[in-house]
Design a protein with these regions (language model features):
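Alpha/beta-hydrolase active-site loop
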Residues: 70-90, 109
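The feature captures the conserved acid-bearing segment of alpha/beta-hydrolase catalytic domains
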Residues: 16-21, 143-200
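Conserved alpha/beta-hydrolase
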Residues: 51-69
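C-terminal catalytic histidine-bearing segment of alpha/beta-hydrolase fold enzymes
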Residues: 35, 71-73, 185-242
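Gly/Ala-rich beta-loop-alpha elbow adjacent to hydrolase catalytic centers
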Residues: 98-107
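Short, surface-exposed "cap/lid" segments of acyl-processing enzymes
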Residues: 9-53
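Hydrolase active-site cap/lid region
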Residues: 109-153, 206, 216-218
């Protein structure tokens, strides 16, 4: 169970990183940190440098989405008010989440409630829940064969997995593209494999190490320098179906 902390959730702080200031790019990456990270994690671990050296034409905003935003159930509203409304005024065309650990669930929660708004979600060492839902998926023979046993809205983790499956199987362009990055020895590897096995191979990037920034940096770098990233972030993909 997630424990709350005494932090005000009336506003969601963020920090913007422009690729070529004062000009803004067409793509905006929104970094949602993990439970033990924070607003500076994307920069302090060198991930921002990897983005800038990759040639990908995108700006980035890192948000201070601490655990309290989840336990208070205000993350989605705060993202909309404090991040996306400002970004829309700026004129960004495509929005991508980088959901790190718990931030992966945050990205999914937002995308679920804002259909068609998010172009893609990069799952970076994602935390996707534990317990009965992943167990059921595994026993069913994988995500694409699984049938949820609860009605929608009864369990947020089940709803998140249903949404992931819809993203993966979608052919209309109405759901976000999913890219998966993680460590080969992550403690959630068994759960991660349920996602990775359902995705096209060119959208899955494993790296040595565990649930840590050693793995995440390596996998992020491999992805950004791949043909997959070049296609996803090219001018031709702007506002086009997947």
């Amino acid at each position: 169970m997630l424990a709350s902390s005494c932090v005000s959730t009336n506003y969601l702080p963020s920090r913007i990183y422009l690729l070529s200031p004062p000009k803004t790019q067409d793509h905006l990456l929104i970094f949602l940190p993990g439970r033990r990270s924070g607003i500076h994690a994307f920069e302090s671990h060198g991930t921002l440098d990897i983005l800038r050296s990759s040639g990908i034409q995108a700006d980035c905003v890192s948000v201070d989405a601490t655990l309290s935003y989840y336990t208070d159930r205000v993350l989605v509203d705060r993202l909309e008010t404090d991040v996306f409304k400002k970004a829309e005024i700026t004129g960004y065309k495509n929005y991508w989440f980088i959901g790190n650990s718990l931030g992966a669930l945050g990205a999914i929660f937002y995308a679920q409630t804002h259909p068609g708004k998010i172009k893609g979600i990069i799952l970076l060492g994602p935390y996707l829940g534990e317990g009965p839902v992943p167990d059921e998926i595994q026993k069913s023979g994988g995500l694409l064969k699984w049938e949820p046993n609860m009605d929608p809205g009864k369990d947020s983790i089940q709803d998140a997995w249903v949404f992931l499956r819809n993203c993966i199987t979608d052919s209309t362009g109405n759901f976000p593209t999913i890219v998966f990055l993680a460590g080969q020895d992550d403690r959630y590897h068994q759960i991660h494999s349920l996602v990775a096995e359902a995705l096209p191979a060119d959208r899955v990037f494993w790296a040595p190490s565990r649930h840590d920034w050693v793995a995440w940096k390596a996998a992020f770098s491999e992805f950004l320098h791949s043909e997959t990233a070049k296609k996803l972030f090219s001018k031709q993909t702007l506002q086009q179906p997947k």
